[in-house]
Every structure is written in C-alpha cells, then in structure tokens.
Amino acid sequence: MRRNLASVGVGTGPTPSVGKPRRERRGGCHTAMPYAVFASPQVAGVGHSEQELRNGKMGYATRTYAYADTAMGSAMNETDGFVKVLADPESGNILGCHIIGPHASMLIHEVVVAMKSGAGTVGDIRDAIHIHPALNEVVHRAFSGQFHAHE
C-alpha cells in the first residue's frame, strides 16, 4: 500500500490541545491514508488498489462513475475524470477509492473520513445527502448503484 510521507507526518504529529501543552503522538492504522498526485489531471486515492486485492486473492466489488455523468462535471466539460470504488461484496466495507480528475485531492477526503470515522461502509457515503449540483456528487454516485463482483 502506498504511503504519502507528508500526510503520515502530519497525521501522527503532536496532538493539539486546549489549555495546556501536550506532546502526545497520534498513531494508529494507516489503511485510510490518502495520497494525491498534483498533475493534470489530479490523481488521488485511499486504501487498497485493485492490483493489491487481485494479488491478495481477495474477493471485491467495483463501481466506476464518470465526472461527465454529473451536472457539475458536465458544466465543467470534464470528459475524462472518474471515481472508482473498491468494496467488500459481503460486508460493504470500503476497501479503496481512486479518483482521476479535477479536484481529486479534495474529493477523496469524504472517503477518508468514512473509512476512518464512520462504519467504513459504502452506505456511509451512499446514504448521505449531497448538494446538487456539486462536483462531489461524482463520489456519491460512485458509491450508489450496482457494484460488479470480482473473484
């Protein structure tokens, strides 16, 4: 699994506190560690890649949704961007999410929060109400609808 060292450093640095100084370190699991490549288009992701799941011989399900199939993506004339979700077909747990397109580095954070703070399931994002028209609808729609199982 890829790790963004700057994000790891910020995420495990001293814990901020109110009132008195504390130097406790945050640590923990890095499965929900996001990464981003600031190229054109942007690339961002969190969790496992499809290749990692295939190599580990894990069953998984995928769903891909194009930016162009949302109102904002269409208004931006975005024809190439997409979101791909990897999930456990039995539990619905989010195994990974990968985004290629404008603002990918910002859009991925909804998935990071769901994986780290929520139940970590597809339903955490699918069941949340999203603003229309907004670009993050592409993330919502990628988590909604029919997933395709892979063995």
Task: Please name every model-derived segment.
Residues 32-37:
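Helix-loop-beta segment of a Rossmann-like dinucleotide-binding subdomain
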Residues 1-31, 92, 134:
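Rossmann-like dinucleotide/flavin-binding elements
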Residues 21, 38-151:
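Flexible, glycine-rich terminal cap/loop adjacent to redox cofactors
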